[in-house]
Design a protein with these regions (language model features):
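Gly/serine-rich nucleotide phosphate-binding loop at the start of the catalytic core
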Residues: 1-76
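Positively charged, helix-rich recognition surfaces that bind polyanionic ligands
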Residues: 5, 161-403
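Short amphipathic alpha-helical segments
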Residues: 20, 24-27, 75, 79, ...
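Acidic carboxylate diad motif detector
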Residues: 53-159, 292, 296
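Long, hydrophobic, amphipathic alpha-helical segments used as structural scaffolds
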Residues: 36-43, 87, 91-98, 171
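Short amphipathic alpha-helical coiled-coil/interface segments
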Residues: 28, 80-87, 238-246
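Generic detection of short hydrophobic beta-strand segments and adjacent strand-loop junctions
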Residues: 7-11, 141-147, 203-206
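Stable alpha-helical structural segments in soluble proteins, enriched in small hydrophobic residues
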Residues: 35, 75-90, 362-374
Length: 403
């Protein structure tokens, strides 16, 4: 089996490549706006959609200047495909019963001066020889990137004060056989990840530093916004601290996901169950501070990182609905569903008490319940959900992440 991965190269605005890549993204924006105008006018006059194939033939025949300004015809065609997808999505939204009576906007033009658009190179548009990828930018310039990857697609994405070059490549992976050794994770705030297993020590990966990053960012952003003049919503300084904050969070998530996969590999755990609720950030009411922290933490980013890293090591990852896993008692083997009264309860913050008075970490209880759900769903014949050593249940190890 194959998995598609991406390697990113960050080009800041002082790099020697920045100006020519910026110009390339500007030309891409020009073609984007021109093609969008053609589709809008065609729809206005005929009430029909101008398809990608019709638009591509039209611009090629006219030898349109924006179409020809990009290094390769395939680069221009990728922009036309981008717009075509947006319009198909727009038409599908119009037909959706859920959107009836709601205002649906057409795809917008990009700003004439400050707008930039993505540039995509297929593997027909670059040379990869002796671990050097040569990328033509214009008639006079090219850039050489050292890489040992079998790159299939290159994307150049303008991000304001920096540009990202994405190298997209495929990698083979093979899932290991079920060895009846499982792990499950429960996601939270102070305890970002609580990992439990039926054969080894429970582990809690700290999330307090992640909260600190968000707290500092929100405080700093509010101060800078209070100094803005008129109707301005952002500034270069706000963009800069947002960029740094996003990079810190991404780095933190990479470190946590790496430690989880490394722990699973070391302990020969071949299956990971992840608890998640769809729409768990919508309409949530945990108080102002907790809402701010919970909504700001990108749990989906962590789950996606875990997904591809698990595949690279042959670990099977299964996402489950974690509803009622925190309320039901794992120790009492309580059925995981809604009850009028539950066997156990939280007696204080972070501490869960079972029916017979056993006390354990509340997140550990939730994580073990997620494992129970996973074993039931997959019809796994686990020897035992509870580890033989009870210290693995009652004494989880806390791991702090260095940033």
């Amino acid at each position: 089996m194959k998995i598609q991965l991406t390697q990113q190269i960050i080009i800041n605005n002082k790099h020697r490549w920045y100006s020519m890549l910026d110009e390339l993204c500007f030309k891409s924006k020009n073609l984007y706006n021109y093609a969008l105008y053609q589709i809008r006018q065609y729809y206005k006059n005929t009430n029909k959609h101008l398809t990608y194939y019709e638009l591509n033939a039209l611009l090629a025949k006219k030898n349109q200047i924006d179409y020809r300004s990009l290094p390769y015809a395939q680069c221009s065609q990728q922009i036309l495909r981008q717009i075509d997808k947006q319009y198909i999505s727009f038409y599908n939204t119009l037909k959706s019963p859920k959107m009836k009576g709601k205002k649906i906007r057409l795809p917008k033009y990009k700003d004439k001066e400050n707008g930039r658009n993505i540039v995509t190179y297929t593997n027909q548009c670059f040379k990869l020889k002796n671990n050097v990828l040569s990328l033509k930018i214009n008639n006079n310039n090219k850039i050489d990137i050292d890489t040992d990857l079998n790159v299939q697609i290159v994307r150049i994405i303008h991000k304001g004060n920096h540009i990202v070059i994405e190298l997209i490549y495929n990698k083979e992976y093979e899932l290991k056989c079920d060895n009846k050794q499982y792990a499950a994770i429960d996601l939270g705030l102070n305890n970002l990840v609580t990992l439990t297993s039926n054969v080894c020590q429970s582990v809690i990966y700290d999330g307090k530093k992640l909260k600190n990053i968000n707290h500092f960012y929100n405080k700093r952003k509010a101060l800078l916004q209070s100094k803005l003049n008129g109707n301005k919503k952002t500034s270069n300084r706000i963009k800069r601290i947002s960029y740094r904050r996003n990079n810190k969070i991404k780095d933190y998530m990479h470190k946590v996901s790496h430690l989880i996969v490394k722990y699973m590999k070391t302990n020969n755990l071949n299956t990971l169950f992840v608890g998640k609720n769809s729409g768990w950030k919508e309409g949530i009411n945990m108080g102002k501070t907790n809402n701010q922290n919970f909504v700001a933490i990108p749990y989906n980013l962590l789950i996606n990182m875990l997904d591809y890293k698990c595949k690279l090591f042959g670990i099977k990852m299964i996402i489950l609905n974690e509803a009622y896993t925190s309320k039901c008692s794992f120790i009492d083997n309580e059925k995981i569903c809604k009850h009028k009264t539950y066997y156990g309860k939280r007696i204080k913050r972070g501490l869960y008490e079972s029916k017979h008075g056993h006390k354990l970490n509340a997140d550990v209880n939730g994580s073990f319940n997620i494992m129970r759900l996973g074993i039931q769903k997959c019809n796994c014949d686990a020897l035992n959900v509870v580890p033989t050593d009870k210290r693995y249940v009652y004494n989880p190890v806390r791991i702090k992440i260095n940033i």
